[in-house]
Amino acid sequence: MAPIEPGASRTAGRRAGASTNKTKNYRVPVRARWLLVFAWALFIWSRSLFPGPESTAQSAVVVDILRPAFEALGVTNATLMSFLVRKAGHFLEYAVFGALLGSTPEDGRPGWRQVVPGLIVPSADETLQRFVPGRSGQLSDVALDCAGVAFGLFVTTGIRSVRRKYRR
């Protein structure tokens, strides 16, 4: 650090309002956050375009990986394992979607701009699946997907709330 001349201010030459904190506040612009939301929705929809047998084969790979954990928990029925993997997949991909939606409001509180896509995207996803060979759209999956969105929004909102509390 260069020596400061007598009578000179440490803040001389800094722009007004500039942070003196050495850690930078790296905020992702709102448009970029919405772009991530849109990209994740496209990812979800792309997964729904796989025909039934291919989707089942992908789930079987995950079941094989998780089989030791299932068996340790006493779950030995392969059909039940597949069902749990598929439903957990629904919930988790929509929890990520909800978390991304939760990152979009500037004030940290989700509003209609987050809730509406959180309802439309799962509904469109299940509708899309009705037109894919070997797939079906189910209302129970829409409900599970919406629960995942709500969970993601809840977690993101909670994290933002805690961060805001400790910033003060």
PLM segments and residue spans:
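Interfacial helix-loop-helix junctions of multi-pass membrane proteins
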Residues: 122-146
